[in-house]
Amino acid sequence: MRSMRSGRDNNICFLGFLSFALISLPSLSLALTNPDDVAAINSLFLALESPLLPGWVASGGDPCGESWQGVLCNASQVETIILISANLGGELGVGLNMFTSLKAMDFSNNHIGGSIPSTLPVSLQNLFLSGNNFTGTIPESLSSLKSLSVMSLNNNLLSGKIPDVFQDLGLMINIDLSSNNLSGPLPPSMQNLSTLTSLLLQNNHLSGELDVLQDLPLKDLNVENNLFNGPIPEKLLSIPNFIKGGNLFNVTIAPSPSPETPPSPTSPKRPFFGPPSPNASAGHGQAHVRSPPSDHHPSRPTPQGKEDSFTSKRIIWISILGAFSFVVLALVCLLCGRKCLRKREDSEQLSKPHLTSEYGRAREGSRSNASMLPPSNTFNKDKEARPKERVGGASKLHGGAERSVGSESKQESHEIDMNGNAMDLMHPSSIPPIKRVIAKATEPAEASLKRTTSKSHGPLTAVKHFTVASLQQHTNSFSHENLIGTGMLGSVYRAELPGGKLFAVRKLDKKSPNHEEEGKFLELVNNIDRIRHANIVQLVGFCSEHSQRLLIHEYCRNGTLHDLLHIDDRLKIELSWNVRVRIALEAAKALEYLHEICDPPSIHRNFKSANILLDDDIRVHVSDCGLAPLISSGAVSQLSGQLLAAYGYGAPEFEYGIYTMKCDVYSFGVVMLELLTGRKSYDKKRDRGEQFLVRWAIPQLHDIDALAKMVDPSLKGDYPAKSLSHFADVISRCVQSEPEYRPLMSEVVQDLSDMIQREHRRNDSNGDNQYTGRR
């Protein structure tokens, strides 16, 4: 009896232990994060002075399983930490090397100080520390980061020399060290950066020559406001975007090196008006080949001293006579040119009333804010120039209506040839037979803009100029209640005018590019104002005063497509299948206009469902168009790429710092997937294999049964099977991993238009047209 009771007690104990183990098992299995990564992120949290970040703790925790803010994982390993403008302080600490596979780290625009740690993770590919308070020198341990491709350390307090650490960093694509206190020459190992395309060094105290850069595949090089000297290597002058002002360069251009050619004994000296550089070099490669110190050094004595002296004097006199002749010739040309210009202006006066009579008057009449523009000739010239620019940027829409410049009227019947002339827009009887005036209409808009903005800082655009005081009044002093959203370029507020008219006011962050330079900001305003399409958010006005830079756009009451699909269940019900296809088509037309019709072409760079605004009729208005110059500069560019990639919109080539029109196409394909499935592009609440929408969806797009299961459940199966299949085919082409296999946006527009036409024909017999209105 006693043995039976003891056996029963043992069974009870065993069952109790088993129950405890089963209860504990889920909590153990949920601890997904690698322990080394947990220790590293705990150490980072303490070094940052324990900021208020959702999920973050000083000890333990599960960053991957609990989705800590700004932390992205791959399986159990932390791969990305993005904490931009999070008001962080403290330092980065010394525990970063404990991360096992951290690839991207972005702490831009915070208040982090101290020195940059020498214990950075060797797995790093992207490092963004711009806009902080880092001091000290750039660590030499960078040489161990052999996977590093992008590094932004700009806008800090770094000092000392750039370390000679680039020997093994052959994957580097972008480097931004601008706006620090760096000094000394460029390190020789920089010549090993065989994949470097962007190097920004402006606003430092760097010195020496640029010869170590001459064989690099650079597309962007900014060295302005430094102490660089010597001749500029000839190869650097072919860089598409080379900014070099504010240095001590000689007028002489250093020739390309040719080691096999010996120096000529009678080669001329440096020009007398430029001081000889102590380090004048034409060399490159591993050993810096310097020019032999023959007669390039005037202080060196030679046997033919008298002949050299005579030759020098002769060269000086020839130079003086040549300069004098050039001045005389320039004066003659100037006088003749002014006479010709007067004659030309006289002839143009005959045609100006006709050129502005129909096209220009529509623009003037539609603008109630003409009095806000600067008086005098600036406005008069602009009135005549704008219609000419418009011809270059006019669009051929696929069944869509193009907005008139600042008016509610539509020009649905006009198809304007971009290579044609202004005569096609007017009644023949109103055109004087002056061919010279018509030919001027084909002048590229950007050329005219650059020429004019270089002479004046006044606004050339006809959009309204608001004051800061008026915008404060209309936004309740930019109150939190009026805040619509916050992005990488600043915050957006709702403004309500006394008559009830609503606008969206974008307050640009003071750290964003072009913020300080008013001329560049006004040029940006002009460029945005020229982007006019029925499916693109229209610029209404701007503000540039008291160091504030603001852009005012039209307001769309139904918010964003992202909110409609993922937040507002009430309105989501109204998104029938046909309406979703129409939304995709209108968004595609906006990108087609930017890529293939707008002059000059434009890349969006930030295309996502949150930037697709919807008006009262659920019509598409794409926002952030024309802001690519802000996004493509410095740390903001890397931030844009990181965010798009982190949230599932980024094309695979983002990893290499590449952004082209085909990246916009990829992002558009992701938005189409959102319309198809009703899912977010990245949803950390879903199972790990379903968090990134593209990865989850691609294998199923060509499986009929799987495709039907992917469709947004809120559609309740109400969609044509063929239309669904065609929609999936377009998505599949847009999200191809190789950019060359993605279609042009005009092809996408054609495919979606054909889909709608087929459905129109199918529904005509039923009198049902669901592609219009809110249904």
Curated annotation (Swiss-Prot):
Residues 254-308, 345-414 are annotated as: Disordered. Glycans are attached at N133, N181, N192, N250, N279. Residues 336-775 are cytoplasmic. It is a single-pass membrane protein. Changing F503L: In strain: cv. Landsberg erecta. GO terms for molecular function: ATP binding; protein kinase activity. Residues 256-278 have a biased composition (Pro residues). Expressed in roots, stems, leaves and flowers. Low expression in seedlings and siliques. Residues 367-379 have a biased composition (Polar residues). Residues 32-314 are extracellular. It is found in: Membrane. Changing L522V: In strain: cv. Landsberg erecta. Changing R361K: In strain: cv. Landsberg erecta. One of its GO terms (cellular component) is plasma membrane. The keyword Transmembrane applies. The keyword Signal applies. Pfam families: LRR_1, LRR_8, LRRNT_2, PK_Tyr_Ser-Thr. LRR repeats lie at residues 101-122, 123-146, 147-169, 171-193, 195-217, 218-238. Not essential for epidermal patterning and not redundant with STRUBBELIG. Belongs to the protein kinase superfamily. Ser/Thr protein kinase family. Over-expression of SRF1B induces no obvious phenotypes while overexpression of SRF1A may lead to seedling lethality in both cv. Landsberg and cv. Columbia. This is Protein STRUBBELIG-RECEPTOR FAMILY 1. The lineage of its organism: Eukaryota, Viridiplantae, Streptophyta, Embryophyta, Tracheophyta. The gene is SRF1.
